[in-house]
Amino acid sequence: MKSDIEICQTATLTRMKTIASNLGLHDDDITPQGPFKAKVNIDALKRLKSEPNGKLILVSAITPTPLGEGKTVTTIGLAQGLAKLGESVSACIRQPSMGPVFGVKGGAAGGGYSQVAPMEELNLHLTGDIHAITAAHNLASAAIDARIYHEQRLGYDVFSEKNELPALRIDPQHVVWKRVMDHNDRALRMVTIGKNEDGKTINGYEREDGFDITAASELMAILALATDLQDLRQRIGRIVVAYNLDGEPVTTEDLQVAGAMTVTMKFAINPTLMQTLEGVPTFVHSGPFANIAHGNSSIIADNIALKLTDYTVTEGGFGSDMGFEKACNIKAPLSEKSPDCAVLVATLRGIKANSGLFPLSPGQSLPKELFAPNKEALDAGLDNLLWHINNCAKYGLPVVVAINRFPEDTQEELDSLLNWVSNLDMNVDVAISEAFVKGGNGTLELAEKVIKACQQETQFTPLYTSEMSLFDKLNAVAIKGYGAERIELSEKAQQQLATFEKLGYQSLSVCMAKTPASISTDGNIKGAPTDFIVPIRELKLCAGAGFIYALCGNVMTMPGLPEKPAFMNLDIDGDGNIVGLS
């Protein structure tokens, strides 16, 4: 079989104006970005406002191996399968960060014959939204240090009188807004800025700082959760970047930089329209990670897609304890549209990996034993699959398990898994997906079962309400969402929690940043652990995004590169063809 990029480069694609027209978009709704992608003007929603919403299908997965279990392949393949059945359908996915593209996982366009195309354009820059977010974010960083420099250089009173601006009196030791870049670079996690020659301050005042990956920026979450340009502007203005010498929050509005940040992101608020290899329209917008942010594509993209097609297929990052949980508890209440069906992706290798019988390490190849028949490992890993089925069902949604088939899978083990799921006494269906090898033809049975599931009445119920305290919300996610015994706040986190509630932020949602390698916060614990403790070492306020960000365990907001990064495989030939991208 050809490589992903070879399949994509030899595919016959439809011009984007035709894709948009067939979708119901007008010429003035789109701004073409070359022949095969276009920006969709958010104003299209005003014209479509009276149209009914279609069905929203949310794709999730079991606890994944480091290489993933094929959520995006299934998302794209399912959309193609629905189209082959004659249904009106679109897909919504996140824009890939170049960190993973050059790091461990590679691209995020799907794979095989279920890809978004052109995949090299999707995986590398696309229409520049991530770069716009990086620029807007770092503009705020520059504004913070410039304000500290000028206020301290002149003195607060002189600065205020000279510039007719209030002195913000930012505490340099209490700046909470790190800089960002769209690469994995562990050397930038902790840096010292403002270094000068002895006795000089021309480079600013020295302080400790650091970098996060752009996908972890609050601006990325804001872009994904904003409902229109005005909402984007208001959310950016609420961002807390530092605290003053009295412990009071300093916002981007206080710095008078929020307007310029929004201007920098003006074009980024418009989703990018692409297509699958089979011509299914696909909206690509925003890219928050699910382990260090809320891990879902944008509300704006969903809203446009839901107005234009009868079915919209989207995905939440990592397992159902991660992006799916955050879609239900953070995204859905803001979008006022809950999912109609959950599709849970499982693989034989992923189930075996959750048996706990094999060592798994990020950046390393999967043990070869995962690809061989092994009844003991398969049986031992079923607890994880059952946990994720129950987790999706607890939100009041019908569940369809999609078994993503790999070439080495045996029919005997596949039949065993099909029978096991079919015999569960609950509202769950199951089908094998061969989206990677067969495209939409490999998901026809899955598509039929998803259509059937979408006809059911849902009883969607998030885990918590906005009226609950922040502590109770954190406990709700840990206990109801993960099956933990309780949360355990560090002394620092306790102080931060008290501060946030004192400042009036108790109505915000909570976003857990934890390892995706386990339902718990310890990536070495596989299966379906119970009665464990969720340690929260630090809390971060994301007032613009509308959530409190809880750092659990040792999760990093700036990834590092592995021993053998994916960028080693990339090159370009004399004709400009990219090779080695996956």
From Swiss-Prot:
Source species taxonomy: Bacteria, Pseudomonadati, Pseudomonadota, Gammaproteobacteria, Vibrionales
GO biological process: tetrahydrofolate interconversion
InterPro entries (alphabetical): Formate_THF_ligase, Formate_THF_ligase_CS, P-loop_NTPase
Name used for this protein in its record: Formate--tetrahydrofolate ligase
Database matches in HAMAP family: FTHFS
Family: Belongs to the formate--tetrahydrofolate ligase family.
Source organism of the structure: Aliivibrio fischeri (strain ATCC 700601 / ES114) (Vibrio fischeri)
Protein EC: 6.3.4.3
NCBIfam families according to UniProt: PRK13505.1, PRK13506.1
Binding site for ATP: T65, P66, L67, G68, E69, G70, K71, T72
A Pfam family assignment: FTHFS
Domain of life: Bacteria
